[in-house]
């Protein structure tokens, strides 16, 4: 009786205890400056965001070994690792372009982590020869009087698009609108819900919808749409998104990191998707930064899912025939991305457990025929963009391209096999993808087996199963 009573009292006491409050969200904004030969980092500001830390306190350490960059938050007194994450950055992409050979640029970047109780050391590392090398450190004292605790201007009401649980137990996706006027707010909400359904209609997200919360924020724009310099269109949209990033007409990013982070701080999030109020084909995606898509493009469903694959799981582009601004690497090493390989050791293929016995490595496919077809398509595409042809004509070209791709690839002997198919990572030779077709290769509607597994691994980092 005594034991039962004691147990009951303990249980009652536990149930009446308030849940431990989540720590605040601390953000270190910094500048990343350099060119192809050197780089410099400098602190901009340290802020406390308006909302508590949205992550699971039991999942603070990143063991995926993904990203070109990696940061650690260490206790300054003991060196104990408190938090870590891998990520990519706009600077990391820009430095691989021709411009970086003869010019310096500065980009604003941010590191977000649970606010510490005691001083911490921030360690930033960069991947070199597939090892992370320390490139910058700085110290943060949570009692520093210069830490900015002010609240930025509100971007408007937070839209609850899909809530399946508390932020700490789910992967939290924030959908932001850019280029939507106050009168177009209802359009943004409809667009956000439409793309949410598109994402969770695509495996493996479809099977994990319950593991996600989805939120929406849409700061009002003075003018409808975002900038597209190649079309003579310039807008001062709230998030600063623009086509023609690095001179690539379809690549849409924003370099207005401060504005982006201040708006996003009004939602619990780990991942960001920016909907652009435009109909011209375009988008972009950077691992653990954000993804973008032109909401009214006919190909938006494909672009949305493809670019989110980059942002969410660090998936590489598997295509190699479209124009990009990046220069090929001087030295070929094994890519860190989970869905491409240099096949330096065929016996140790990173997805070998998914390869059926008897599948040849490398795996044959009608590459010459495919390359010839794509060469014609890309020549037409460049000509049409140079002539500023109507978007309807571009859509017709893309439909023709997809039809030819499907006819060519669907009937191939290894069309459904996991293997190592040459042509990936923007290179025709020397890099290989896991399956003949995938949404990361063409406008195919789904992910391959390797990409699906990589996505599920990241879901497990943020959602309590």
Where are these regions (language model features)?
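Catalytic Zn2+-binding segment of zinc metalloproteases
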Residues: 308-324
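Short amphipathic, basic-aromatic surface patches that mediate peripheral association
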Residues: 23-62
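Short pre-active-site segment immediately N-terminal to the catalytic Zn-binding motif
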Residues: 185-188, 283-308
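Short coil-to-beta strand junction motifs in C2/discoidin
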Residues: 57-69, 190-191
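Fold-level signature of zinc-dependent metallopeptidase catalytic domains
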Residues: 144-203, 216-226
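Active-site-proximal segments of metallohydrolase catalytic domains
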Residues: 211-287
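Extended acidic/polar, glycine-enriched regions
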Residues: 100-167
